Amino acid sequence: MGESDLSFTKLFEFRNEDDAIFHNVVELVKDKLSKNLKLNVNEALLVYCAHIVSEIRSNNTESEIANNSSKILTRDNVLIGVPESLREITFNITLDNFPKKIIKYTEPIPTVNYIMVDSKTNGS
């Protein structure tokens, strides 16, 4: 019997004056994705964080934001092990003048058989 999964906490915290830095880092990660390079855990978390910030500023609800999580990244966008590390992600967000929101993603990157599937032979 293996050990149970251990959760970890990653804190993204920035003030308004850090907004430009946040957006520059997000653009660097998006550039990496556009070159078909795979993201590590920290980069994947940043993508989800940026998505949430954008969705909150568009006045979307917590459930609308959470329901779109499976469309953000796929197993082909991330390194092996990232989907397992991010089986459940909870963001506690206080942004601008919006009330605090709690966004929870459950298995945002599907893990079912992703190591066993060869995208070249599957046509993906």
Predicted regions: what they are:
Residues 1-123:
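Non-transmembrane, aqueous-exposed alpha-helical and coiled segments at domain scale
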